Each structure stands twice: as C-alpha cells, then as structure tokens.
Amino acid sequence: MCLLALGFLLGILQPASGQFPRACASSESLLRKECCPLWAGDGSPCGELSGRGSCQEILLSRAPLGPQFPFTGVDDREDWPAVFYNRTCQCNSNFMGFNCGECRFGFSGPNCAERRMRMRRSIFQLSTREKNKFLAYLNLAKHTPSQDYVIATGTYAQMNNGLTPMFRNISVYDLFVWMHYYVSRDTLLGDASVWRDIDFAHEAPGFLPWHRLFLVLWEHEIQKITGDENFTIPYWDWRDAEGCDVCTDELMGDRHPTNPQLLSPASFFSSWQ
C-alpha cells in the first residue's frame, strides 16, 4: 500500500511511496532488491497460497521524463521503486498492501468481497463531540509509532547499495508528513548540490489523484490505530471562504497573538513538534 503512493506522481514516476515496509528494510531485502513480505494469514509471500497475490517483477513506464528534470540515474525516486526493489507484491482482486494483507479502499471482510461505503462530512457539520474525537485521533496518530513502515534516512548510495540500511521509526502522523516531503523535495545531486526546479508532488500530472490517494491512505492508517472502521476525514469547502475558517483554536489552531509564525498557545496543536 505504501509502495503505491509516491510513484503515482513520479512516473508519473512509478507506483510506491517514500516510505518502506518495515519487513523490507533489511540488508537482505535490499541486496535481493525484493519486497515480498510474508502474509501472516498463511505464511506465504504476498499471501500467494491464499490467492491474494504473488511476487512479481515491477513494470516500469517507458514514457520520457519532462524537460524540467534533465537528469537520469541521480535521484532514488526515478522509476520508483526500482533503485531499491525490482520485485514487489502484485495483489489480486480486492486485496492490497505491501504483502496483500489488506482490502482495497471501499472493501472489507475476510476475503475483501464486501462493499463498504463511508461518508465524509464537512468539518462544520460535526458536533462538538465529533470534533473532539477527530482531534484526539490526530493526536493519537502523532504519538503512535508506525508498526508497518519506516523512513529512509539516507540515499541508496549512502546505504552502500543496500549493504548498510539507513532507516528510522516514525509516528503514523509524521509518516505522512515525511511522505509528502519526500515526493516534493529537491533532487540531491551529490557534493552538496541540489536541483531545485522540480516538485514531483505539485508539478506533475498526478497532482489531484495522488493527493486524494494520499489522504485516503492516511485515513486508512488512522482507522487501523483507532479500531474505528467508520472514521473518515472531514473536509473543508473553502470555495467561498474569505479567510481561514478552520484556523480557530477549536479546530486547526489560530495564530499566536504576538508571533505570527506560531500557533496560538490555546490550540490543541501548539505543543506538537
């Protein structure tokens, strides 16, 4: 699943995300260039014994890159995730995930065959209790380490081509902060040089659908840590807004009264790092 989001923009470059399944962060996986973890339900890679998926060679786009990125072979995100892995789980039917252990969005049940509809509501339609629950869920995600994913703290070259993995733990909330940063950051050219004239997150043809997938995945991870399968992210319709209607201390936080770079100390989020 997290080997899906980043490349929707990048190959838009190729299906994946900037984060790595914990099960694939070992030197063994990197040296084999294979990310096909066992599914706990049957103990086979990608749940193959149960027909969930199989370990397959990744398919790379042959479309040329745009002129705004005049490099080849300098960025780990090119042809993602081929720099790190060339075999990943390809899931069947309504299964998804790095080991095909979960259901595609909109499906549930032991065989992922049951349709599940959820409704997203305007944040201004939520009751006080519902708003407080939403904020509590965000706070839980901020302080809950991700069980499934880690983030890279170095490039593939810095990892000695997989021989010395460089990963660290991260919270569920910060995983998505990092994912968004990873897909949009500058290209590192080596020798402290960077190419700044690129933003795969916001200057690529997948801008809208990638961000939608990004939010649905974030929503899914919060459902998992809270056990609330009915949780949905509320939306803010700002089409006619004359200001930031959600920038209040009851919602996403007002401005600090003396420092416009900070949140109001009365905000739920003012203590976040």
Curated annotation (Swiss-Prot):
Signal sequence interval, chain numbering: 1-18
Coiled-coil residue spans: none
Binding site for Cu cation: 180, 202, 211
Predominant subcellular localization, coarse grouping: membrane
EC number: 1.14.18.1
InterPro entries, per the entry: Di-copper_centre_dom_sf, Tyrosinase/Hemocyanin, Tyrosinase_Cu-bd
GO BP term, pick one: melanin biosynthetic process
Disulfide bonding pattern of the chain: none
Keyword Oxidoreductase: yes
Cofactor: Cu(2+)
Top-level class of the enzyme under EC nomenclature: oxidoreductase
Gene Ontology terms: cellular component: melanosome membrane
Residues carrying a glycan: 86, 169, 230
One Pfam family from the record: Tyrosinase
Membrane topology: Single-pass type I membrane protein
Parts of the chain that traverse the membrane: none
A GO MF term: tyrosinase activity
Catalytic activity: 2 L-dopa + O2 = 2 L-dopaquinone + 2 H2O; L-tyrosine + O2 = L-dopaquinone + H2O
Domain of life: Eukaryota
Family membership noted in the UniProt record: Belongs to the tyrosinase family.
Biological role: This is a copper-containing oxidase that functions in the formation of pigments such as melanins and other polyphenolic compounds.
Protein name, UniProt field: Tyrosinase
Organism: Pelodiscus sinensis
Lineage of the organism: Eukaryota, Metazoa, Chordata, Craniata, Vertebrata
